[in-house]
Amino acid sequence: MAPAGLLQTSLIWVAYGVAVALVLLVSVITTLTWQTPHERSIAVSIVSIISLTALLATVFLLPVDIALVSSTASAHLGAKKDWATPGRVDGILLTLKIVYYTLYTLDALLCLIVIPFTYFWFEEYDEVEEEEGTSSAAARIWRALKYTLGFVFLVVILFLIGFFVPAAGNNPGKHMDLDYFKRLLAANNGEKALTFGVGLLITLGTLLYILYTSAGLALLPVSFIKSAPSISAPQLSATTASALEHNRELQRQLEMRNSGRPEGMSQKDRREMDALLREERTLVRRERLAAEARGDNRSKIYRAWTKVEAVFRPLKLLGGIFLLLLAILIWVSMLITGIDKAANSICKQHCGYILGHLNVFQPINWIFVQSAKAFPVDYILMALLVLLFFSSSITGLATIGIRFLWVRIFQLKKGRTAPQALLIATVLLGPHDPRHQLRGRHARGAAVRHLRHADLLRQPAAATRASSPTAASTATWCAPAPRPSASPAAIGRLHADRHVHLPQPRPPSNWPRLRRPSTSGPSSSSSPSSSSSSSPASSRTPRLNLSELDEEAEVDERGGPAGPAPAAALARPGAISPAAPRRTPPRRARRVMARRLGTRMGVGRARGVKLNGGAATENDKKEKKNGTWVWAWVWEWEWQTDWLAE
């Protein structure tokens, strides 16, 4: 029987290794796809890839924990298998514990030191100083290190609060003598400080979980249902070609009308010509985008992928409907469990509303229990559920953006995400802690009041299914069920499980208010998903936002050197080509320009800025309403002023 157990545990670890390799590939693709190519940094890309890989590896370790621990016991009886001797079980737990502590330590180092240092290091880069040679790598590293040390100092203060405050509150005497510090160390307050720090991060992660994941659960299925090509290439190409031909005809008429005048164009005609030239630049950009959407000058692989994507469009629609139903099912399960906890918890808020057993039918729990009859199905479902929550968090981040209260600091878009936004998004995803509940093949102890952990493992009759009722619902103390898990104590102590009933000598947490609400607890966290998912927006055809399209194309052209001009732009003699090569303006120079124009970061729209003076024509007013006319003046101002040389 020993080779069978060794084979099963080895297969679990091999599956985990394959999952981590796939996670690494997904992290690389995600980072390179979302990051803007104009401000791409090798250091930021590497740190983002490593952080996402470590985060997802930590998340996917939870199903591995469930699978390894459950493999030592019979799925039908709850008794230990013959090969699961205490030595083998201890070896499995030791391996799991090493992996747990390694990943959690790596996550902590990345979130508290590496990512802040990379963020400040990237912020300290200045292209003007680099060209002038006034900035050195050592000075840049030192400035970034100063800000990072300040951030670490704040984290240390939080740990000191967790170290001193609880013990000081329990000891009203003197607090500054040597005996007091000895008592602190003897009382294992170092672990309590770690518990406080992790609990604080998990509490913040829960708020992010409620804000971003709940919105993502609604928006992810809707995006699948409403998804359409970002640009309707044939329609946009035909419309743009017609508008461009009409525009150039109007320009030709103006030129012919003023060709015989010795004083040149009148002021009115010049304003109209300027408006037509701005409109021409916009139409040329749209024509270029339509050509890119059609796959012109693209590889055969790209065009083949576009055709395959169009063929599988109905399956994508069905997948969106399935995800929508799944999101509603998850919300219903969370609502049921929240009501069950509020009504039937024995110890109420004193232990985090823990349940001795389920009193109301819970659909998600029933699915896990039934899927446990086929060996790997329940673990695959657990991994897919975790992946769904993680994908929903990313969708919520991309939709809502990185905000402070109502102020949007960064926006996440494919191919347009700033490196700083990528690093902050990685940190925001870090505190997400989708802990599993004891569902499916988890074995737990029956109602034996003073039975210790080791005694429970030796008595198969005392183990029952995680979903079965228990007679211990009248117990007065609620504590985590004795399960041989390798999850770190400081983290496991913060998670009050719902299938628990045995007494424990000490309270489960030094900071009971910082317990992580269980996945089925905060039913309000996903309530927006049901209201948003049932909105009429899910049945409307996506509309093409031309003003946003023009703005993004303008940013692309301003962000780097452009390629050769489209043939349509050079068809008429004297046409203005928007594709003249130009250098990438440095971030600090763009900020100077933003302050002069009243824009935000040199990319936002200026309000009431018109650099050539004069009254706006009717076309100007229409274009101002769409937010496009300001860009033409910003573009001309950049060409007419030599601010790069300053």
Curated annotation (Swiss-Prot):
Alphabetically ordered keywords of this record: Cobalamin, Cobalt, Glycoprotein, Lysosome, Membrane, Transmembrane, Transmembrane helix, Transport
Glycan attachment points: N297, N545, N626
TM regions (residue ranges): 11-31, 42-62, 102-122, 149-169, 193-213, 317-337, 380-400
Segments of this protein annotated with the region Disordered: 459-588, 603-623
Signal peptide: none
Gene Ontology biological-process entries: protein localization to vacuole
Low complexity composition-biased segments: 460-490, 517-543, 565-582
Topology of the protein relative to the lipid bilayer: Multi-pass membrane protein
GO MF entries: cobalamin binding
Compartment(s) where it occurs, according to its Swiss-Prot or TrEMBL record: Lysosome membrane
GO cellular component, one term: vacuolar membrane
Family that this chain belongs to: Belongs to the LIMR family. LMBRD1 subfamily.
Function of the protein: Probable lysosomal cobalamin transporter. Required to export cobalamin from lysosomes allowing its conversion to cofactors.
Protein name: Probable lysosomal cobalamin transporter
Species lineage: Eukaryota, Fungi, Dikarya, Ascomycota, Pezizomycotina
